[in-house]
Amino acid sequence: MAGKTLYDKLWDDHVVTQRDDGSCLLYIDRHLLHEVTSPQAFEGLQLAGRQPWRLSANVATPDHNVPTSKKERDQGIAGIEDDTSRIQVQTLDDNCKAFNIVEFGINDIRQGIVHVVGPEQGLTLPGMTVVCGDSHTATHGAFGCLAHGIGTSEVEHVLATQCLVQKKSKNMLVRVDGVLGKGVTPKDVVLAIIGKIGTAGGTGYAIEFGGQVFRDMSIEGRMTVCNMAIEAGARVGMVAVDDKTIEYVKGRSYAPKGEQWEQAVAYWNTLHSDDDAVFDAVVELNGAEIEPQVSWGTSPEMVIPVSKAVPTLEQAKDDVQRNDWTRAYQYMGLNAGQALADIQLDRVFIGSCTNSRIEDIRAAAEVVKGRKVAPSIKQAMIVPGSGLVKQQAEKEGLDKIFLEAGFEWREPGCSMCLAMNADKLQPGEHCASTSNRNFEGRQGNGGRTHLVSPAMAAAAAIAGHFVDVRSF
């Protein structure tokens, strides 16, 4: 009998019962909540007269709608100028108090983007099933977790029962061996993977990321990669547990202590695919060949190395891709064969659940130090992923580096990743963004998003256009 994959092990450890149609009832260990996908779920509980099944499994924080300007944040919820945003944040606060759920509120130093806060607090632990009403919940798979996003009705179901009905995915291994070159980051790795397999390449699969590149990668880097598993078409992305994983978790607020810690570590050390495990699909890349990446179009798969030009229609593989590229040229205001350096940038955004952790901010600061934002850039902003990330960056003096260069230093939140708060692009503006999606209108109506790493975004802010950070 063949060995088990990491996904198989996590799945089997959480099956409550298997149903006649092949689906399973899975137990959920951790449920993270935010203000956008939870109101209807809480309302459903109230109408049915139910209470959460296991209070301690649930933790909430507002992130999508919170303003990132200090002026608004200093006034708390009452200072949120947008009515819809204020109501959503207030409703989360009210619901958490009514149901006695732990919330890191808008004025709590622990507040931040839910996928930054969970690991930071030790709420995310190896071997857990982790869900949240947010598609980028795969982030937590970096800890050897089975983590995925859920819809609002499922949020209610988890609150009420601590279980979910799920169908098992197939197994895919994405192996990246070799050593990354100078200036090549985890963001470049995951963009290169998506560029290779496409945004539908992982559909129906749980992706395990393996190989030397991921063994060498930091935990924060692994979070960046797992975060974008959904952009590769997979609902789940994960990396096996190793000593780095355990060291990262150790001593965090919600991590086990004492004898429970020793028991947990013994289990966590089993969370890797067996040597004889069989995957349904295997994709391989050579890490040494990956360059800094830049997305040029309106899908994360429309991505190229910084050394390349916008592709021409002759390079398209079929009529569908030709049609997609033609529409992307028009929306993005680009020409086939255009050099990336010729794209005039308007704004730069460094933040989001993909790239707003302390390592990301350090990487950007290293590029920015002693330089100035180009006069042609209308706005360059740094948005830390949590209050604690912001605090650590300020302790290291990174905020001063950015402020002296002409960047804005903001309060934590999802910010310009999505057009659900005050931080938006204007129609026609090009933005170098460290976020995860570049769909039409994602950062604002008519906004044009280019996905890059923090280092590449920082270099673009200084140059006013895309440059190869390796020679910057």
Curated annotation (Swiss-Prot):
Disulfide bonds: none annotated. Its cofactor is [4Fe-4S] cluster. It comes from the Bacteria. [4Fe-4S] cluster binds at residues 353, 414, 417. Binds 1 [4Fe-4S] cluster per subunit. One of its GO terms (molecular function) is 4 iron, 4 sulfur cluster binding. Transmembrane segments: none annotated. The keyword Zinc does not apply. Its EC number is 4.2.1.33. Keywords: 4Fe-4S, Amino-acid biosynthesis, Branched-chain amino acid biosynthesis, Iron, Iron-sulfur, Leucine biosynthesis, Lyase, Metal-binding. GO terms for biological process: L-leucine biosynthetic process. It catalyses: (2R,3S)-3-isopropylmalate = (2S)-2-isopropylmalate. It holds the Pfam family Aconitase. Pathway: Amino-acid biosynthesis; L-leucine biosynthesis; L-leucine from 3-methyl-2-oxobutanoate: step 2/4. Catalyzes the isomerization between 2-isopropylmalate and 3-isopropylmalate, via the formation of 2-isopropylmaleate. Belongs to the aconitase/IPM isomerase family. LeuC type 1 subfamily. Heterodimer of LeuC and LeuD. This is 3-isopropylmalate dehydratase large subunit. It comes from Acinetobacter baumannii (strain AB307-0294).
